[in-house]
Amino acid sequence: MGVKLQAVQSLQALDVELFRFVNERLANPFFDVVMPFASGNVFFVPLVLATGILLVWKGRVRGLVCVLMLALVLPLGDGLIYRTIKHAVGRPRPFLTLTEVRRPGGKNDAKARPPPSTAQPNGRPPASGSGSMPSAHAANWFAATMIAFIYYRRSIRFMLPLALLVSFSRIYNGVHYPSDVVAGAALGAGYAAAAVWLLAALWGSSGRKWFPILWARLPSLLDPTLHPAPGSSEVGHLAEDTRHELQ
């Protein structure tokens, strides 16, 4: 037991040291502007919406299936899995427990000390706040990266750098430890791959029974290929088949 406890304490100390390195030693005026922006939604929400529209328009059935997977998998993971784990682990964020934490773009741009009223006696984050482990930002971005990679292999060239940038920004901004980000990335990528596989398997087994016409045209959600009738678009024909099945 003593050896295990010592190992855990060593890992925690390493986690704090890595956090300090990113949050303090890598600090510079350029990152102080870029990293809060990378963690925010001002740019990324319109980008995601525009990308979704472009995928449906240009990607035809493959793009439509990819967007549907993103719309199904990401909200479920963020609202149920990640938040449940955050509450169960109850790890306070770095700026709540460590001194001299930089929070660029936050309420305190200078080095901040943890407010005495924010942490509960048991060390858990306040009820109105959000825990540190895992990072939902990292989980969501790596989940999106995994789903995009499943349907578009070349997307890894720009999705992975974006996911890494957002994840790094969470440490730099003082709101997550490195282990929070690593755990979130692994959880998000693994959960997304499993969810896509499960939904595809469910479609393969139940689609044949409940939507035979649509299933005959689109038997696989992992490699979505539709053979439309002459003179009709793939997405348009898929929508027509769906309406027919639901009538």
What are the residue ranges of the model-derived segments?
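N-terminal transmembrane-helix/juxtamembrane module of multi-pass inner/ER membrane proteins
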Residues: 1-47, 81-127, 243-247
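Transmembrane helix-bundle signature of multi-pass membrane transporters/permeases
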Residues: 71, 102-105, 163, 185-186
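Membrane-helix interface segments
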Residues: 30, 59-65, 151-158
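Alpha-helical transmembrane segments in multi-pass membrane proteins
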Residues: 69, 73-78, 82, 86, ...
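Alpha-helical transmembrane segments of integral membrane proteins
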Residues: 35, 65-73, 155-158, 179-183
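Interfacial segments of alpha-helical transmembrane regions
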Residues: 48, 52-81
